[in-house]
């Protein structure tokens, strides 16, 4: 909400995120292309006077009809220009070959204009067919400039009638306008992927089947008042009356600026006590008959139901098994991202799939959505893996707590990268449960594609010794259970849902066998006897 794009003087600004929220409040649903054009196509130099009407009536492609293209003086004539002039205005910074293709195409267009015949049409269409991708991207917004199938040749009369707009106009002006607008179109499409990732990461904007909506709409409409958000879409920083800043430099130039400072949403939107009370009242009206304290539970329950529907539709158990099998070979990484989420790393996707496998293993009874410590999009897609201070997945049940630690590190790397954090997370979780006296059994599962033999045995051995919490140094625990399970074994457990409780109980008994009395002061006592 604080992100702004400023003009060169650091005065006028445009806020893409506020525009996105405003558009989705007003329109409810937009196609992805229309959404990206709206958000990325505006700037601090845009006239926002009729932004309400503009957003309300916006159709895909409208952004390009509103852009004025200044035609260079050298191109303001009907004549064929020189190659030097052409190259100066029709540039391709990625490839000189591209400019050569444009030049050939330009000359063949003029050849046709000079002599409209079957011969010149054939040469023109042959050039187009051989360079279709480059030419469509440069002059056709990614669409076909000519609609003829490969090898198809219309008569001169048919061709002239079909492309009358192109050939009756000033060709130099026509091509330059198409070239300039296609470049803007290409930039919007190129950056749309990044824009999509950023908005998905917020968790409140949903992308599904080519459409964009606000997630938790019933809640967001209470929090984001349309008129307030509209007023924040654009403005002049010197006309704002904010105590936190009064210039561009104070807004975002330093680490102590308003932009870099940690601020809550009510501060950003300037919601004071009276306004916050109004928001609470609006939420109360939306959830009629429910106390304000119960509303988060209602929303969470709805979110869990939506997640269950999403999993049933997109990740049935057999598909989960198929995807898990792909992790055996890291050359499958591209296929894994295509199957799950191009926005997430493969290790993040592995954590996600481990959780789904466990969901099926439990007979769908565990709340895997709230057990993930990785970040999910509003569409339940994985985005960012769990932070270093937490277990990857922590599942709280009535009688037990399970922690799943997932890694794609190979057997050798595990010794350096996983031993300490997995052990630390397991100890801290068990100490926390014992401190709260919950009487729940705590079990950790270390899930990887393969294991080092020492890793397996060390996890078994640590159950026999007392271990110290890293968070509360005065607290110790023993019988820390860390059970290694490989990916193939986890996949097999998906079909063992009827044995879920029994298998976890067997794991505990397996580790309890080796529990022994252990003197945690053994080293000190020994050293006192010899020094």
What kind of feature is each model-predicted range?
Residues 1-256, 272-292:
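Donor-sugar nucleotide-binding helix/loop cap in glycosyltransferases
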Residues 250, 259, 265, 270-531:
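Catalytic core segments in nucleotide and nucleic-acid processing enzymes
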